[in-house]
C-alpha cells in the first residue's frame, strides 16, 4: 500500500479487517450501535461480499440505516467509487439525502436526466424509478463508467410495469454491487421484481428469496416497532341507485361485493355521518395519547384529493386547528411533510404521498379512509405508524368493518413473499371501481356514476389486536366507546392484551347488570338475533375459550387462534362467518379437554 492511497486498515466492527478511507467526520447517528438485525445482516453481507443482496425488514425497523452502513463500508474499502439510490418518490430522494448526511455521506437529490452532471464532492445521487425508466441508457453509461453501488429502496416497485423492470435491468445490470431493500417483498401480480432471486417450492411455485429477513413479529419482540391496535367501525349505510331505489346494508355483515362497495363508499363520504363520527373518535384517541406523548400525530389516508380537502375542512371545524394537507401534484408537498415531521401539530391528511417510505416517527393515530385494499398498499400504509421511539408506545388505526381489511389487520404479523403464478391470486380489482393507490388523485370511478350515498351511522364494532378480536359493538359517542378511546398511550403488548380483556369483561358485566336492573325487557328478547349480534356473541365466546386455553396450555393467544384456523380453516376471527366461529368454538373446547 502506498502513502498516496490515504488508506489504512482497521478492525471491522462486524468482524474481520477492512481497508478504510474516512468518508467524513463521524456524526452522532453514525456512532450509534446497530440494532441486532442490522448487525447480523452486516456480518452476513461482509462475509459473503455478494453482488446482489436483498434485505427484507419490517417498515420502521431501520432499513435506511443498514444501507447507509453498507454504503460507508464499500466506499471506505474502495470496493465501489460511487453510489446510486433509487426510490419510489421525489420526497424520498430528499429524505435519503438527509439521512445520508447524518452518516457523513453526501448524496445529490437534484440529479436529473436533463442535467446528469454532479459535483465530485458527492458520494452519489438519488433518483426515482420513473426517472430511470425514462432514460435507462443514460444511467447504464453512468454505471459502467465507475464502480457503482446501486441501492433499490422498496424494490417491489421495480415490477410496477414491464417497461420499468426492463429499464432497471438495462440501467444497472453492470453495477458492481446491488443492494435491494423492502418492507413488503410481495406484489399483487406476477410481474417479477428485478434482481430478486426466485426459487421453486414444493408446489412448483416460484417464491422470492431474501438474503436477510426481519419480520414485524421479530420487531415487536425486540421493541423496534410498535404494536398496532385496530379500532373497527361498522354502521348502517344507505344509498340510492340509478333507478332511484333506496338500499341499506350494514358494514361488517356478510354482503355481496357490490353491496360492500357501496356501503364502504357511503361510509367514506365526507358529507355523511360516518366519517365525522370516526374523525371525532380518532381525535379523542390522539388527545389521549398526547397526554403521555405530547408530539404524537395523526394521519388520515384519503381516497382522492376531493375527499382529502373535505376531511381537512371537517378536522379544522372539529379541532380549531388547520391540518397539514399533502397532495402529490402540489410542489410544496415535500416541504410540508418535512415540516410536519419536525413540529408538534396534530393532523396530516394525504392521499398516497405518505403511504410508503416516508419517515414521520411521531405518527401514532391513523384513519384508513381509502378504498385501497391490496395487501401491499395496506401494509405500506400501516407501516407509517409502527416506528417505535419510546418503550410502550402503541399505534391506533381506525378502519371500516370490511372483510378484506379485517383479514389484513388480523394478519399484520404474517410474513409474505412474492409468489409467481399463484393460483386464486387475490384480485387487484377494487370493488369500488378503482384502486386509489394507482388511479389519479382526482379521478372518479364508475361506482359514483350509478349510485348516490344517503348516509351511514357509525358504531365501534370491535378492537383487533395481536390477531384477536375484543369488545362488543357500541354506538359512536357512547360511554363504552370512550372507555376504549381512553386506553393509556404507553403500554407494552402484554399490558395492552390484558387491558383489552379486562375492559371487554367489564363492558359485558355492565350490560348484563343494566338489563337485570331495568324493568324494561331486552328489546332483542323473543326475537331472532341479527347476524351482527350473532357474530359478536360468537366472537366473544371464542375469545373467552381461547383465554381459558391460554391459561391451560401456556400458549400465546395468537398461537391458539392460528392453531384453530389450521384445524378448522377460514379467515381470522374478525372476518370469520357464523359456521366458522362455531367450528372453532367446538375445536377449542376439544383443545381445553386435552391433557396439558
Swiss-Prot record:
Chain ranges of the Helicase ATP-binding domain: 44-203
Region (Disordered): 420-444, 506-533
Family: To M.tuberculosis Rv2917.
Compositionally biased spans, kind Polar residues: 510-523
Gene3D superfamilies: P-loop containing nucleotide triphosphate hydrolases
GO MF annotation: an example: DNA binding
Name of the protein this chain belongs to: Uncharacterized protein ML1624
Species classification: Bacteria, Bacillati, Actinomycetota, Actinomycetes, Mycobacteriales
Taxonomic source organism: Mycobacterium leprae (strain TN)
InterPro entries: Helicase/UvrB_N, Helicase_ATP-bd, Helicase_Restrict-Modif_Enz, P-loop_NTPase
Amino acid at each position: 500500500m502506498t502513502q498516496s492511497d490515504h488508506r489504512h486498515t482497521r478492525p471491522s466492527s462486524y468482524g474481520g479487517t477492512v481497508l478504510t478511507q474516512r468518508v467524513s467526520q463521524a456524526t452522532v447517528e453514525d456512532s450509534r450501535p446497530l440494532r441486532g438485525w442490522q448487525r447480523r445482516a452486516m456480518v452476513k453481507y461482509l462475509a459473503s461480499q455478494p453482488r446482489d443482496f436483498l434485505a427484507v425488514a419490517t417498515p420502521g425497523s431501520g432499513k435506511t440505516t443498514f444501507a447507509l452502513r453498507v454504503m460507508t463500508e464499500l466506499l471506505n474499502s474502495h470496493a465501489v467509487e460511487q453510489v446510486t439510490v433509487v426510490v419510489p418518490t421525489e420526497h424520498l430522494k430528499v429524505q435519503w439525502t438527509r439521512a445520508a448526511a447524518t452518516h457523513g455521506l453526501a448524496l445529490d437529490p437534484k440529479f436529473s436526466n436533463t442535467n446528469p452532471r454532479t459535483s465530485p464532492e458527492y458520494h452519489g445521487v438519488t433518483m426515482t424509478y420513473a426517472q430511470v425508466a425514462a432514460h435507462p441508457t443514460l444511467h447504464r453509461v453512468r454505471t459502467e463508467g465507475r464502480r457503482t453501488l446501486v441501492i433499490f429502496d422498496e424494490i417491489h416497485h421495480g415490477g410496477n410495469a414491464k417497461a420499468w423492470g426492463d429499464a432497471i435491468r438495462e440501467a444497472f445490470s453492470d453495477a458492481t454491487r446491488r443492494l435491494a431493500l423492502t418492507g413488503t417483498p410481495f406484489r399483487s401480480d406476477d410481474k417479477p421484481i428485478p434482481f430478486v432471486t426466485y426459487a421453486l417450492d414444493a408446489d412448483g411455485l416460484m417464491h422470492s428469496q431474501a438474503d436477510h429477513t426481519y419480520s414485524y413479529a421479530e420487531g415487536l419482540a425486540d421493541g423496534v416497532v410498535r404494536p398496532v391496535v385496530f379500532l373497527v367501525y361498522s354502521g348502517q349505510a344507505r344509498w340510492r341507485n340509478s333507478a332511484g331505489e333506496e338500499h341499506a346494508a350494514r358494514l361488517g355483515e356478510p354482503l355481496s361485493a357490490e353491496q360492500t362497495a357501496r356501503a364502504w363508499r357511503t361510509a367514506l363520504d365526507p358529507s355523511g355521518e360516518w366519517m365525522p363520527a370516526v374523525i371525532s373518535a380518532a381525535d379523542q384517541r390522539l388527545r389521549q395519547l398526547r397526554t403521555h406523548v405530547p408530539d404524537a400525530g395523526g394521519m388520515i389516508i384519503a381516497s382522492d384529493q376531493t375527499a382529502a380537502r373535505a376531511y381537512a375542512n371537517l378536522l379544522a371545524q372539529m379541532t380549531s386547528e388547520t391540518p397539514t394537507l399533502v397532495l402529490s401534484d402540489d410542489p410544496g408537498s415535500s416541504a410540508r411533510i418535512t415540516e410536519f415531521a419536525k413540529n408538534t401539530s396534530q393532523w396530516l391528511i394525504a392521499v398516497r404521498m405518505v403511504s410508503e417510505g416516508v419517515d414521520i416517527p411521531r405518527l401514532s393515530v391513523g384513519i384508513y379512509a381509502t378504498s385501497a385494499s391490496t395487501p401491499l398498499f395496506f401494509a405500506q400504509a400501516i407501516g407509517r405508524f409502527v416506528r417505535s421511539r419510546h418503550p410502550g408506545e402503541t399505534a391506533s388505526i381506525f378502519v371500516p368493518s370490511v372483510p378484506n381489511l379485517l383479514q389484513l389487520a388480523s394478519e399484520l404479523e404474517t410474513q409474505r413473499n412474492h409468489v409467481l403464478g399463484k393460483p386464486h391470486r387475490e384480485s387487484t380489482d377494487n370493488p369500488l371501481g378503482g384502486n386509489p393507490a394507482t388511479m389519479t388523485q382526482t379521478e372518479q370511478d364508475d361506482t359514483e356514476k350509478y349510485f348516490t350515498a344517503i348516509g351511514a351511522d357509525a358504531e365501534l364494532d370491535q378492537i383487533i389486536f395481536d390477531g384477536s378480536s375484543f369488545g362488543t359493538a357500541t354506538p359512536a359517542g357512547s360511554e363504552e366507546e370512550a372507555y376504549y378511546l381512553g386506553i393509556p398511550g404507553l403500554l407494552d403488548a402484554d399490558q395492552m392484551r390484558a387491558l383489552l380483556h379486562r375492559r371487554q369483561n367489564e363492558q359485558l358485566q355492565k350490560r348484563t347488570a343494566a338489563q337485570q336492573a331495568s324493568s324494561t325487557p331486552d328489546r332483542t328478547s323473543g326475537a331472532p338475533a341479527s347476524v351482527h349480534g350473532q357474530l359478536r356473541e360468537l366472537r366473544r365466546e371464542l375469545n373467552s375459550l381461547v383465554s381459558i386455553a391460554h391459561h391451560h396450555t401456556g400458549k400465546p393467544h395468537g398461537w391458539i387462534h392460528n392453531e384453530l384456523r389450521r384445524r378448522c380453516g377460514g379467515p381470522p376471527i374478525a372476518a370469520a362467518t357464523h359456521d366458522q366461529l362455531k367450528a372453532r368454538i367446538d375445536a377449542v373446547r376439544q383443545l381445553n379437554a386435552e391433557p396439558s
